């Protein structure tokens, strides 16, 4: 089966969140099942220094009043074909943000649609998050191309309908308040990145005002758990680690803990309880909860805490204050570093993920793979992947709490600290966590089943009257009434992309 992945990220070259890992690893697993899988991403300027890219474009065309060129290259690890949409708008050293973000990704989606129609026609076009959300709308008119839309994070929903109409062609049949809503309505299948998250987003607590729409499309909504590349992330062979280890040979793991403590300026002592955190430093990840409980935890236990990541400046500053107030106990490194992240997974005793919401989460899978016990909130994909520790029955893989409250998180931390005192049972807990097999192969087979369901099939158009019931609406900003939301767009450019009308 011919499958084209369209996304804003692809690890390791372009990665901000978990989507980059999915777009890199899932196609490789699908290719091993015998499918012809290719990727298309924006041609970010930094890629020309990282990849061997064709000198001349393989396709040049116009859309949304601007010219684009498509270049071909290969993924550095999977060797799968990657197509890069080239345009000066992708030149700055950024992936997200900027005043032109809405235009930039809508342009990428439009260029991808033109490429799929005219150059390499897939049977399934797999779109990821709002950046590619208009593609299912346009492909709704093409019976030969089916679409799958994956929700990685429902919070980010793309430009509203009024803005889309001034940037690009919105077909007469299109409905939905914004890009994310339109994608969910017109994709032939929609999936969230874990079974629990697919249920949560149908509720008001996690639905981001889209719960009504998600219940309306529930018949085509799926939940498929993310995985990890077990070869790429293997503590027995990972060359980045000071000492390799496995579930059958744990004795050398302590060398990684000592190396981590030394590098982060902590007291080098294997008996200290070392907690790690890697990721975006934002409210979603529960960094504010960590800030509220850290001083008490450090005062009443012998714990050490290491934090790696970037994000909200207020949270970063608060973490710095903690590090200054607790030298040798609390360390923070405000950047992303692959080597250091691996060292935290391999050297920490436990891994912190007190998330407000978590579509799937990959960090907890990597932590378990490397023997760091996850301490998580029971939400989203964390529910599907972390089994609560039961010392009596000697089962479970981590520590879980329910409410997003400091006292609940603190209680889970103290429970884990007490469990760490019992070294023999703690090692058994580590071994159970390390032997969990959340590979992409299992997930790929579920995606394959979904592709077969939709190949050659188009979902009926949504009922516009029913959809209107779920509209939350947003009026156009009067100050933008005469603004042109494109690069070199003339007044009638929204008509230039019309097809099959």
UniProtKB/Swiss-Prot annotation:
Region Disordered: list its residue ranges: 476-501
- This entry's Enzyme Commission designation comes to 2.4.1.21
Q: Which reaction does it catalyse?
A: [(1->4)-alpha-D-glucosyl](n) + ADP-alpha-D-glucose = [(1->4)-alpha-D-glucosyl](n+1) + ADP + H(+)
Q: Name one Pfam family in it.
A: Glycos_transf_1
> Broadest EC class?
transferase
User: Which example biological process does GO assign this protein?
Assistant: glycogen biosynthetic process
- Keyword line: Glycogen biosynthesis, Glycosyltransferase, Transferase
Q: Which InterPro entries match?
A: Glyco_trans_1, GS/SS, Starch_synth_cat_dom
Which Gene3D superfamilies does this chain map to?
Glycogen Phosphorylase B
| Similarity section | Belongs to the glycosyltransferase 1 family. Bacterial/plant glycogen synthase subfamily.
User: Which HAMAP family does this entry report, sorted A to Z?
Assistant: Glycogen_synth
According to UniProt, the name of this protein is: Glycogen synthase
Organism listed in the record: Prochlorococcus marinus (strain SARG / CCMP1375 / SS120)
């Amino acid at each position: 089966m011919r499958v084209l992945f369209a996304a804003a990220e692809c690890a390791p070259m372009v990665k901000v969140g978990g989507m980059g890992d999915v777009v890199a690893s899932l196609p490789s697993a699908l290719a091993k099942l015998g499918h012809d899988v290719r990727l298309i991403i924006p041609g970010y300027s930094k890629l020309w220094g990282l990849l061997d890219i064709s000198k001349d474009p393989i396709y040049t065309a116009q859309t949304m009043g601007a010219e684009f060129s498509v270049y071909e290259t290969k993924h550095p690890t999977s060797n799968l074909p990657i197509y890069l949409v080239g345009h000066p708008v992708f030149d700055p050293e950024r992936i997200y943000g900027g005043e032109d973000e809405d235009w930039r990704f809508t342009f990428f989606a439009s260029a991808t649609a033109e490429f799929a129609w005219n150059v390499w026609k897939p049977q399934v076009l797999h779109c990821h998050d709002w950046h590619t959300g208009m593609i299912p709308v346009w492909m709704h008119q093409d019976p030969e191309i089916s679409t799958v839309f994956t929700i990685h994070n429902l919070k980010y929903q793309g430009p509203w309908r009024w803005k889309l109409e001034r940037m690009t062609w919105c077909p007469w049949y299109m409905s939905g308040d914004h890009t994310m809503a339109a994608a969910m309505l017109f994709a032939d299948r929609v999936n969230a990145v874990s079974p629990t998250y697919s249920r949560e987003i149908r509720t008001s607590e996690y639905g981001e005002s889209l719960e009504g729409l998600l219940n309306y499309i529930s018949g085509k909504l799926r939940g498929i758990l993310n995985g990890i590349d077990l070869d790429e992330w293997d503590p027995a062979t990972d060359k980045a680690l000071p000492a390799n280890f496995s579930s059958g040979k744990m004795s050398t793991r302590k060398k990684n803990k000592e190396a981590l403590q030394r590098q982060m300026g902590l007291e080098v002592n294997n008996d200290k309880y070392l907690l790690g955190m890697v990721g975006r430093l934002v409210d979603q990840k529960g960094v504010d909860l960590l800030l509220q409980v850290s001083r008490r935890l450090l005062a009443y236990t012998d714990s050490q805490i290491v934090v790696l990541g970037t994000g909200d400046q207020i949270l970063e500053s608060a973490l710095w204050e903690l590090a200054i107030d607790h030298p040798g106990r609390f360390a923070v490194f405000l950047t992303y570093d692959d080597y250091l992240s691996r060292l935290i997974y391999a050297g920490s005793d436990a891994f912190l993920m007190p998330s407000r919401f978590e579509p799937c989460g990959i960090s907890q899978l990597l932590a378990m793979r490397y023997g760091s016990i996850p301490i998580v909130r029971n939400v989203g994909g964390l529910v599907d992947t972390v089994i609560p520790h039961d010392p009596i029955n000697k089962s479970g893989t981590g520590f879980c709490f329910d409410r997003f409250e400091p006292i609940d998180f603190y209680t889970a931390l103290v429970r884990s600290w007490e469990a760490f005192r019992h070294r023999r049972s703690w090692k058994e807990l580590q071994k159970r966590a390390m032997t969990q097999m959340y590979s992409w192969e299992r997930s790929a087979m579920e995606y394959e089943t979904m592709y077969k369901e939709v190949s050659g099939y188009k979902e009926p158009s949504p009922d516009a009257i029913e959809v209107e019931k779920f509209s939350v609406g947003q009026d156009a900003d009067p100050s933008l009434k005469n603004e042109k939301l494109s690069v070199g767009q003339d007044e009638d450019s929204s008509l230039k992309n019309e097809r099959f009308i």
